[in-house]
A protein has these predicted regions:
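Low-complexity, intrinsically disordered regions enriched in charged/polar residues
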Residues: 7, 19-20, 88
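C-terminal motif of bacterial Sec signal peptides marking the signal peptidase cleavage site
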Residues: 24-28
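Bacterial N-terminal signal peptides that target proteins for export
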Residues: 2-16
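N-terminal targeting/export leaders
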Residues: 2, 29-146
């Protein structure tokens, strides 16, 4: 083979490898989305980061700040519940942020992390009297779709 053909072939192989590596890199990158502004808790802010792991599960990490204690809402509630929507399930309770057990700090910051085998399409938070409730009440914070 001539040197020109070998160089061209080597360049094509390298370009293909870079393309494949780029696809895998973007596939494993986390998506980070901010919660929309809330009319119920106007100062509340937060983000949701969803990342696919090596086992094809999705790690869901929620960071919150300036989220008023649920007992200070009108009407007063006991806890915040985090919900997930997927293409397979309309809505699922994935956990709670309970201020009485110090999940919500004095600085009104909280974080939450869980793993799901199903990719979420939307994450939202409600204030509830019961953290094990199966259907959501009024939404406090919500994301657009992923």
């Amino acid at each position: 083979m001539s040197t020109k053909i070998q160089t061209s072939l080597t360049q094509n192989i390298l370009l293909c490898l870079i393309g494949i590596m780029t696809i895998f890199l973007f596939e494993s990158c986390a998506r980070k989305i901010a919660f929309q502004a809330s009319t119920i808790v106007p100062g509340a802010e937060g983000t949701v980061k969803v990342k696919k792991d090596n086992n094809s599960n999705y790690t869901i990490h929620v960071e919150l700040s300036n989220l008023a204690e649920p007992r200070k809402l009108e009407p007063a509630m006991k806890t915040y519940v985090i919900w997930m929507e997927t293409e397979q399930e309309p809505v699922k309770n994935i956990g709670q942020i309970n201020s009485s057990s110090s999940f919500l700090s004095k600085r009104l910051k909280a974080s939450f992390e869980t793993v799901s085998s199903i990719k979420p399409t939307r994450i939202f938070i409600t204030a509830e009297d019961d953290g094990t409730i199966q259907y959501p009440g009024t939404q406090i914070l919500t994301t657009n779709g992923f």
